[in-house]
Amino acid sequence: TATASGVAYYDLPTLRQELADADLITLLIGSNDTVLQLMGAMGRATNGKATKLLIPLLTGTMRELNLQTLQTLRKGLENLDLTPEELKAALKLLDSGMEEICDQTRDQTVANVEQILQELRALNPDAQIILVGYYNPLPFLPTYGRHFRLLNRSVKALAQQYGADYVSIPYTSIANDGHPTVCGHKYIARQILKAVRK
């Protein structure tokens, strides 16, 4: 890895050689794919007005499905000054449209992970590959719970298919921005270390 103007970049031939020579490869990818698709869809549905609503959704202000969360969501929608069409589109997205986005994104994420596992195995058939699963960054959204359960099931099957070790991380402690806390990172590290072959 090198940097140019503070931006990290990778020299692909060097990276490929390092992967070919590695004894252990850990892989944790695709976690943001669904969140980014949801943000884009909500922005399109509300002509860009939904940013004010997405911030509390994605920063963890609304972590649980309770009265306070529903009131915050309702107030957030009211404060967006949406047209009736935009409100209808936003509510449809939060109701049933998100499931379609999750299904499409999950299929693409699984395909991407499979392609990466194929390439890693071609480069290094003998390395231990540890494929880390996913935690749910938005636990109050039932669609996301289903999405991440199915995604973990699919990725675990891929790990078995390509001779990788799957590591589950469902109890990751999450910060307000949806990313693991320091304790969450330590938990993930402990789960990975348990899977490392001696």
Regions found by a protein language model. Name each.
Residues 1-99, 103-104:
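Conserved SGNH/GDSL esterase-like catalytic core that processes O-acyl groups on lipids
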Residues 17-21, 123, 160-161:
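Extracellular/periplasmic catalytic domains that process cell-envelope and extracellular macromolecules
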Residues 23, 156, 176-198:
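Histidine-centered active-site loop/cap adjacent to the catalytic His
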Residues 23-28, 128-133, 165-168:
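Structural recognition of the beta-strand scaffold that forms the well-ordered cores
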Residues 90-110, 138-144, 176-177:
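Surface-exposed cleft-lining segments at the edges of enzyme active sites
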Residues 113-117, 152:
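Generic structural signal for well-ordered alpha-helices
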Residues 117-124:
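Surface-exposed amphipathic alpha-helices with a cationic face
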Residues 136-169:
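Substrate-gating cap/lid alpha-helix
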